[in-house]
Amino acid sequence: MRKRAPVCYMMILIVLIMGICCSCQSKNKKVERVKDLEFTVVPDQNVPKELLQIINEKKESPFKLKYTSTDNEFLYIVVGYGAQNTGGYSISVDDLYLTTNAIYIDTNLIGPSKNEEITMVSTYPYVVVKLPYQEENVVFR
């Protein structure tokens, strides 16, 4: 029994060291920005009907999606933050850029300000971003 204890401790130590090494590698991976992308935040009345239907089906829970226009002219990126208990929320698009293999988007949900009169009704904040069509995958941050 005593001979097995050092072997078990050694195995546990090896697994821990491997875990630490693997996690360090993925964190050090830098994404090289190729260029910032021009985009438009689309108001509800200008969102394609099919996309609006998808948003309405998903809006209860947080969601992220990309949608291509039927003519492949535009790419729509949508980020929804799910049901919120009050009104007064907004969403900022903090970054949207192209890398060598993906489009990265960073958004932020902004709560109601302390000075703002808050409506006590459930809301479903989301943002729809439109840009010229690109094939790259979208990475949501």
Model region roles, listed by residue range:
Residues 15-16:
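Classic N-terminal secretory signal peptides
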Residues 4-9, 19-141:
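Exposed, flexible binding/inhibitory loops of compact, secreted disulfide-stabilized domains
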